[in-house]
Amino acid sequence: MKQFNEFYQKIATNRLGHWLNTLPAQLSHWHESELHGEFKHWQKTLDALPVVDANSAIDITNTVKVGESGDLDQGQFKRLENLMKKFKPWRKGPYHIHGLHIDTEWRSDFKWDRLAEHISDLSGKYVLDIGCGSGYHLWRMRGAGAKFVVGIDPTQLFLMQFNAIKHFIDDSPVHLLPLGVEQLPELKAFDTVFAMGVLYHRRSPIDFLYQLKAQLVKGGELVLETLIVDGDENTVLVPGERYAKMRNVWFLPSEKAMCAWLERCGFNNVRVVNTDITALDEQRKTEWIDTESLQDFLDPNDSSKTIEGYPAPKRAIFIANA
């Protein structure tokens, strides 16, 4: 795909150049044998997106917004809306594209607001976001001054959603690759690595933490957000078949247990900068998804519990240095 060739050209002349030893072969294999059955339809939808005045105002500092509501006539606006809805479900956002409000399931801006004041200045930094979804936070990282932003997520619909937004922003230092963390070599090249909402999906959280550490420069910063439970340093919840209707949830540590894991893996200066119970105004059903959302995952008679009887989702943000 053309976008990957552009990425190769970019990293050939920067500190990520050694990634070229493995990445092209991985993405070539992905493109030849692992494409989703709907991928060609998504690509046609992407190709049909309108080309709007390149001088449109772009704001990725305070939100992710391109242009204004008067940029398109009624017919153009409706066509844009119909095309973007072909990429449903939209999980993470929101986005504002020429007056179109993509009201995603998650208000990912809430999470950004919780962490932004605690992280190191991103100005001039190389940043990696692992499990980045459709890339909402990639744009906010760029808006915060990052020099080069890379997101990885193996879900192909997220790649197409990212490409749809990038069609209107076209900010070349922001990239999304359809990879899982296990496919990354030890790059040791990023100043800041974000891993938000991923750890509890990993069968081996300790291996995952080592994988994160292997992407950071010496002294680089890890920003990790994950589900937690109350308890001491020995408290870890291992749910049964499902947690909040999710099948792939493996480990929910306490704050102290998570800190101990990070320290055991060689991170230092470990601290918790925020804890927050996920609220119904942060994750909810909208017209941009066709599935259930948080309200459906909680006990209808006791919102402090999941429908399975576990503690309701509570998240913490940890920051540490490699």
Swiss-Prot record:
Record key words, sorted: Transferase, tRNA processing
List of residues binding carboxy-S-adenosyl-L-methionine: 92, 106, 111, 131, 153-155, 181-182, 196, 200, 315
Catalytic activity: carboxy-S-adenosyl-L-methionine + 5-hydroxyuridine(34) in tRNA = 5-carboxymethoxyuridine(34) in tRNA + S-adenosyl-L-homocysteine + H(+)
Keyword Transferase: yes
One BP annotation, GO: tRNA wobble uridine modification
Enzyme nomenclature, EC number: 2.5.1.-
Top-tier EC class: transferase
Function: Catalyzes carboxymethyl transfer from carboxy-S-adenosyl-L-methionine (Cx-SAM) to 5-hydroxyuridine (ho5U) to form 5-carboxymethoxyuridine (cmo5U) at position 34 in tRNAs.
Subunit structure: Homotetramer.
UniProt protein name: tRNA U34 carboxymethyltransferase
Phylogenetic placement of the source organism: Bacteria, Pseudomonadati, Pseudomonadota, Gammaproteobacteria, Alteromonadales
The encoding gene: cmoB
